[in-house]
Amino acid sequence: MAELMLLSEIADPTRFFTDNLLSPEDWGLQNSTLYSGLDEVAEEQTQLFRCPEQDVPFDGSSLDVGMDVSPSEPPWELLPIFPDLQVKSEPSSPCSSSSLSSESSRLSTEPSSEALGVGEVLHVKTESLAPPLCLLGDDPTSSFETVQINVIPTSDDSSDVQTKIEPVSPCSSVNSEASLLSADSSSQAFIGEEVLEVKTESLSPSGCLLWDVPAPSLGAVQISMGPSLDGSSGKALPTRKPPLQPKPVVLTTVPMPSRAVPPSTTVLLQSLVQPPPVSPVVLIQGAIRVQPEGPAPSLPRPERKSIVPAPMPGNSCPPEVDAKLLKRQQRMIKNRESACQSRRKKKEYLQGLEARLQAVLADNQQLRRENAALRRRLEALLAENSELKLGSGNRKVVCIMVFLLFIAFNFGPVSISEPPSAPISPRMNKGEPQPRRHLLGFSEQEPVQGVEPLQGSSQGPKEPQPSPTDQPSFSNLTAFPGGAKELLLRDLDQLFLSSDCRHFNRTESLRLADELSGWVQRHQRGRRKIPQRAQERQKSQPRKKSPPVKAVPIQPPGPPERDSVGQLQLYRHPDRSQPAFLDAIDRREDTFYVVSFRRDHLLLPAISHNKTSRPKMSLVMPAMAPNETLSGRGAPGDYEEMMQIECEVMDTRVIHIKTSTVPPSLRKQPSPTPGNATGGPLPVSAASQAHQASHQPLYLNHP
């Protein structure tokens, strides 16, 4: 048996290499037709090839192949008639025409060397017309197609005819279409002639659709030798017109059964070019000449051979391999395209990432600067806030301290050192105890010596009198030195006068002033009736309009000790009074004064005190009514007439009076006896009661 080898290519395999990377320009719009053409071939390749179950003989009426034997000696006489032919069809390289011829010669010598016997090589040359237009490249090659047939005899009287068919021209593309063998195309084989001329009509493509490299022809011509059905010579076998279909690069082995009649062979020609249905069809007639390589011996008798196209494959047996190869090539192209696109996308993505990174870095730097500025501003604000907090705290503390100090100076107790006192009498230096105040009293048994009746008003000028060298010192805790005392007094006067502005009745004020003046005058007249007094007392009570009377300081220290019983006596010679004494008591014209040098006084403290008003003080002293009938009390011995003066304490202070300024009548006093307000002696019961009252807690007397 013989094998039928089919080989077809749709593209040059040398075009693709491992290091052949397509540039982005290769995937432009100019190569879109190549991809569309490959896709169409992939879709139609399953319909182009079919595996026939049996060989279909061609009749001479269907295929008219004329073969003219030009040489004088036919090449078929010396060669045995082989029933099978092995045809190998390969496209030539589209590089140059020299490569075509070299490839043809190389392929033609290979089967001859493998033959078992002496063989001859038949060259079949097919000529075709040039296409009207070629769009593939700049160097269109020749349009001739050379078919080389090698006929090699075998040991079992079987000859294999190897035929190499080269493509007509590199301008033929995938879209080229071959028409069926018509009646115009004829193939005649003459036994007696050495030259076998095969006249075929082939289609020429209208134009090449590839741009860069012209693709080889996809068509292939298959020539097979088979036994002739009829033994008559000189008549061509009836053949039919099979379509020429394209076939990818594939090596197909088709077993051919041996025929019983060896003299008759059948040559089948099959074109594997399938053009698109819309492309124009151009018929090209070419003559195929088979020439022997060596001298061909003459044959005893000519035999007729019919060249018929090979049967079309019906099933999808060979296309399975072809489809894989085509898909692999398409995958290769798509992979390269996708790789290029992925690289381009990756590059664009990286460029976008770099741009975004630069923008983010710029924003980050700007945010860092803003953050630093805000941090500095925050630190400045915190420092300022801390300073303000400390300042406000100090300010609050200072305000509170000033307020507390003001309260302490105005309402709290003040301890101020007292000024230097006057010279102390020798009796005080001897350590005699200072007498205390007690109730005033008069004694009738001991008349007062050297007392003159009071003449004139108490408001007149005083007569200067000599004073002894010794004088007691008065002091208390509220004494002030020098100018500070006067300033504090003025401030206190302003404070009390401004805070207590009471409204008073003018008529009532005049009535009180007149009553006090009358009391002083009556007391002075009553004192004139007394011839002599046991002690000299001096009392100065000026006449003024304002009702309040200044009180004598409480518990004055240090005068000479006197009798516990004494008599109240007014100053009787205002004309001879000393100005030094009046200046010592700081006499004012609008104030009544009650001056007493006695130590016996009954002092009753206040049980409660109203903090919203000044402290009040009531003075109760002996007084005499204008006449006894006005008193309304009956006999003078039953009742004591007393003058009660209600006043508010404006100020208390300690004054120092020199002993020399005190009138002589008031300096030395005998032991007084208790008496009444009119100068009369007090009853013994009253004196004893006064002495007993000194032991009570509400009385202050001499110890």
Swiss-Prot record:
PROSITE patterns: BZIP, BZIP_BASIC. The chain crosses the membrane at residues 397-417. SUPFAM superfamilies: Leucine zipper domain. Residues 327-347 are annotated as: Basic motif. Residues 2-86 are annotated as: Transcription activation. It is a single-pass type II membrane protein. Residues 325-388 form the bZIP domain. The basic domain functions as a nuclear localization signal. The basic leucine-zipper domain is sufficient for association with the NF-Y trimer and binding to ERSE. This is Cyclic AMP-dependent transcription factor ATF-6 beta. It comes from Homo sapiens. The lineage of its organism: Eukaryota, Metazoa, Chordata, Craniata, Vertebrata. The gene is ATF6B.
